[in-house]
UniProtKB/Swiss-Prot annotation:
Domain of life: Eukaryota
Pfam families to which the protein is assigned, alphabetical: Isochorismatase
Native organism: Homo sapiens
Gene responsible for this protein: ISOC1
Phosphotyrosine sites (modified residues): 160
Family affiliation: Belongs to the isochorismatase family.
UniProt entry keywords in alphabetical sequence: Phosphoprotein
Lineage: Eukaryota, Metazoa, Chordata, Craniata, Vertebrata
Keyword presence, Lyase: no
InterPro entries named among the record's database cross-references: Isochorismatase-like_dom, Isochorismatase-like_sf, Isochorismatase_domain
The protein, known as: Isochorismatase domain-containing protein 1
Positions where N6-succinyllysine occurs in the chain: 279
Keyword Phosphoprotein among UniProt keywords: yes
A GO cellular component annotation in the UniProt record: peroxisome
Length: 298
């Protein structure tokens, strides 16, 4: 990992601190990607010690080939700002480690061990309103079958299920890691963050469901803002309005989010015909995905 300024990257001897800070130390909340972990550092700790602490807390999830910058949450502005030059920790604070730039040489790579599938709000009450809903259900089910074959964790949300119903019956939720109700549009809930924290080395999220311009868009932007690479499956996401869907996908692609297809995702995950699961994935995609009107309006 290259930092924004020189830093000692050796791991500290001690582990993460508990809820209370020891004498002579200051409590600090360390945020990385979708995670946030409380710890403590010595009073007066600077940039290098903060980097060491990030590595001790998140070492197995940080891509050492990428460049990162440390930012401090500024109450005055209500947002994160780059760590001021010569900064020293003197009081309780919140810091985060964010990618400084995207490595184009690795952009878009998917591996089963570093990928999670997000299935967003594929619920019964949306059936009459969402364009080509039957098609995206079919493709979504194919993706979940692929996830089971490859051992990829799946997280499913349902938007206000009391009023909008549960996930449609055609979507088989056997073996999914989590099914969560929500009212927030984004899928990035505290329970989702906790679930991701239990999965080592998460780099990428494959995202699909409804609606493209609301829950899908807000989930994708929040994940990217936390350093997660997002792949949106175009043939498994839709909206009530094709215009909303089209402009959402265009906007998301401009932010570096990858707009892809279900077959591209599944074949990228096996990567080689000699992969032990290739035959099962091949059988899954033998029947082409539905040629719906979605594909002419990406």
């Amino acid at each position: 990992m290259a930092a924004a300024e020189p830093a000692v990257l050796a791991l500290p001897n001690s582990g993460a601190g508990g809820a209370g800070a020891p004498s002579g130390t200051v409590p600090v909340l360390f945020c990385f990607s979708v995670f946030a972990r409380p710890s403590s550092v010595p009073h007066g700790a600077g940039y290098e010690l903060l980097i060491q602490k990030f590595l001790s807390l998140y070492g197995d999830q940080i891509d050492m080939h990428r460049k990162f910058v440390v930012q401090l949450f500024a109450e005055e502005w209500g947002q994160y700002v780059d760590l001021p030059k010569g900064f020293a920790v003197s009081e309780r604070c919140k810091v985060r480690l964010v990618p400084l730039q995207i490595q184009l040489t690795t952009l878009g790579n998917l591996t089963p061990s570093s990928t999670v599938f997000f299935c967003c709000d594929m619920q019964e009450r949306f059936r009459p309103a969402i364009k080509y809903f039957g098609d995206i259900i079919s493709v979504g089910q194919r993706l979940l079958q692929g996830a089971r074959i490859l051992g990829i964790p799946v997280i499913v949300t349902e938007q206000y299920p009391k009023g909008l119903g549960s996930t449609v019956q055609e979507i088989d939720l056997t073996g999914v890691k989590l099914v969560l109700p929500k009212t927030k549009f984004s899928m990035v809930l505290p329970e989702v963050e906790a679930a991701l924290a239990e999965i080592p080395g998460v780099r990428s999220v494959v995202l699909f469901g409804v609606e493209t311009h609301v829950c899908i868009q807000q989930t994708a932007l929040e994940l990217v803002g936390r350093g997660v690479e997002v792949h949106i499956v175009a043939d498994a996401t839709s909206s009530r309005s094709m215009m909303d869907r089209m402009f959402a996908l265009e906007r998301l692609a401009r932010t570096g989010i990858i707009v892809t297809t279900s077959e591209a995702v599944l074949l990228q995950l096996v990567a080689d015909k000699d992969h032990p699961k290739f035959k099962e994935i091949q059988n899954l995609i033998k029947a082409s995905a539905p040629e719906s009107g979605l594909l002419s309006k990406v």
